[in-house]
Amino acid sequence: MAIVPKRKTSKQRKRLRRSHHALDIQNLVKCSNCSQKIQQHRTCMFCGFYKNKKVEGFQARNDR
């Protein structure tokens, strides 16, 4: 036989358990080359620069 819960999980307890599942807000910074907002520690998708250096083999987006 399988184990069965002793009591029904209340709405409050269920929601408190899920309160840690929320997504975090992204931390955006300005690109040092083109001043667009980008995520930290990522290559700029608009100009292809990372830490003031051009990343080789990176295809920058031109749609914006």
Curated annotation (Swiss-Prot):
Keywords: Ribonucleoprotein, Ribosomal protein
Organism placement in taxonomy: Bacteria, Bacillati, Mycoplasmatota, Mycoplasmoidales, Metamycoplasmataceae
PANTHER family reported in the protein's UniProt record: 50S RIBOSOMAL PROTEIN L32, LARGE RIBOSOMAL SUBUNIT PROTEIN BL32
Molecular function terms, GO-annotated: structural constituent of ribosome
Family: Belongs to the bacterial ribosomal protein bL32 family.
GO biological process: translation
Any single Pfam family the record assigns to this protein: Ribosomal_L32p
Record-level GO cellular component terms: large ribosomal subunit
Listed InterPro entries: Ribosomal_bL32 (IPR002677), Ribosomal_bL32_bact (IPR044957), Ribosomal_zn-bd (IPR011332)
Protein name: Large ribosomal subunit protein bL32
